[in-house]
């Protein structure tokens, strides 16, 4: 079968830059790599074909020969080979292409012993507080289960007086090699999980793990103004890492209980206060509670309508990030009386007889609009 044009194989033009060649090859190599397509002969052939094309076009001298003479430049017996292709990939460097995908790649020397330090797991703790506690902020002791570094072996997993041995599978490199077509791929050692070490004399307290289960108690600070659903990160308070790895983090998820009187929206609080028809009509002064445990007075002017809001500046929740407080909004709800006695009914009947349109402007406007609607 005739070989395909190398530029067609990579899907690039003859004027493609080295970066464009590398990018095109990487996409094909990742797509058709045998590790991603085990047992797929067609993918393996395309993988090899792409590698052959890139091996030529990425080399300046070979590319020039190919541009001048095509595939004939690399056929045996000719004097035009300029070092030859020889069926392999010559001096092309593929390691940088696969570094982020496969780790150390190719048949080169190992970059030295690599120890895998495993970071500890993050933990979650759900903490419930009242709205008053969210207003004031608080310190609280919490207790939770976690893992801590074993003090007996100082976290290395070996008995006191012993040290981990070099892994017998990877020789301490943390990686093993396997052949994939034209390539030799270095992968994480399955025996030592990349640490390069084996525990041959395990610590009896932690069974060679380096960590132990523990119950931990710490004091946490809940800042003023914390809202429901706030997540607080406590760095390094999670589970212990292994093989010298860093601890994970502890995340506090704050649940602020709903309040019987106050409703919250961001840093503002809302409060509903019922008043009688007489107080709404004649005006009055009301006294309301505030979230800090104090009291505040509000003057209700005569003629106050149902649902009217009054703003008390700075009487809301503290800003969690910054200074100052939100506001408290008090909404007055006019309550219509029920179960009236004879005297109350008589007074209201008298009031109905003497009330006029001026006293009820909204009613007057409504009937004016209604009459206009009915006429039309």
Swiss-Prot record:
Binds 2 Zn(2+) ions per monomer. One of its GO terms (cellular component) is cytoplasm. It is found in: Cytoplasm. A zinc finger (CR-type) spans 137-215. InterPro entries: DnaJ (IPR012724), DnaJ_C (IPR002939), DnaJ_domain (IPR001623), HSP40/DnaJ_pept-bd (IPR008971), HSP_DnaJ_Cys-rich_dom (IPR001305), HSP_DnaJ_Cys-rich_dom_sf (IPR036410), J_dom_sf (IPR036869). CXXCXGXG motif repeats lie at residues 150-157, 167-174, 189-196, 203-210. GO terms for molecular function: ATP binding; heat shock protein binding; unfolded protein binding; zinc ion binding. One of its GO terms (biological process) is response to heat. The J domain is necessary and sufficient to stimulate DnaK ATPase activity. Zinc center 1 plays an important role in the autonomous, DnaK-independent chaperone activity of DnaJ. Zinc center 2 is essential for interaction with DnaK and for DnaJ activity. This is Chaperone protein DnaJ. It comes from Pelagibacter ubique (strain HTCC1062). The gene is dnaJ.
């Amino acid at each position: 079968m005739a070989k395909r044009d190398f530029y067609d194989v990579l899907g690039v033009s003859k004027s493609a830059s080295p970066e464009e060649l590398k990018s095109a090859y990487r996409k094909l190599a990742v797509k058709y790599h045998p590790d991603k397509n085990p047992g797929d002969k067609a993918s393996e052939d395309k993988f090899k074909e792409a590698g052959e094309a890139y091996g030529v076009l990425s080399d300046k001298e070979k590319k020039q020969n190919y541009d001048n003479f095509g595939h004939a430049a690399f056929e045996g017996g000719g004097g035009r080979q300029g070092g030859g292709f020889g069926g392999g990939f010559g001096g092309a460097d593929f390691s940088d292409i696969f570094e982020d995908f496969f780790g150390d790649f190719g048949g080169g020397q190992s970059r030295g012993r690599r120890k895998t330090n495993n970071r500890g797991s993050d933990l979650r703790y759900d903490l419930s507080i009242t709205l008053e506690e969210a207003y004031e902020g608080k310190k609280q002791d919490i207790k939770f289960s976690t893992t801590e570094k074993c003090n007996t072996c100082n976290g290395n997993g070996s008995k006191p007086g012993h040290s981990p041995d070099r892994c017998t599978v990877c020789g301490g490199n943390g990686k093993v090699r396997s052949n994939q077509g034209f390539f030799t791929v270095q992968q994480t050692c399955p025996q030592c999980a990349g640490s390069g070490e084996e525990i041959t004399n395990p610590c009896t307290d932690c069974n060679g793990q380096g960590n132990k289960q523990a119950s931990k108690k710490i004091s946490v600070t809940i800042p003023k103004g914390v809202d429901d659903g706030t997540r607080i990160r406590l760095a390094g308070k999670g589970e212990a890492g292994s093989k010298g790895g860093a601890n994970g983090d502890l995340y506090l998820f704050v649940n602020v209980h709903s309040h019987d009187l106050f409703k919250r929206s961001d840093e503002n609080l809302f409060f509903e206060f019922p008043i009688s028809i007489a107080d709404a009509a004649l005006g009055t002064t009301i006294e309301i509670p505030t979230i800090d445990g104090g009291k505040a007075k509000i003057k209700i002017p005569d003629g106050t309508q149902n649902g009217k809001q009054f703003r008390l500046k700075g009487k809301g929740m503290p800003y969690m990030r910054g200074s100052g407080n939100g506001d408290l909004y008090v909404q007055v709800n006019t309550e219509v009386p029920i179960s009236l006695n004879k005297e109350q009914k008589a007074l209201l009947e008298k009031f109905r007889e003497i009330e006029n349109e001026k006293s009820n402007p909204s009613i007057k406007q409504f009937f004016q609009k209604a009459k206009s609607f009915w006429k039309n």
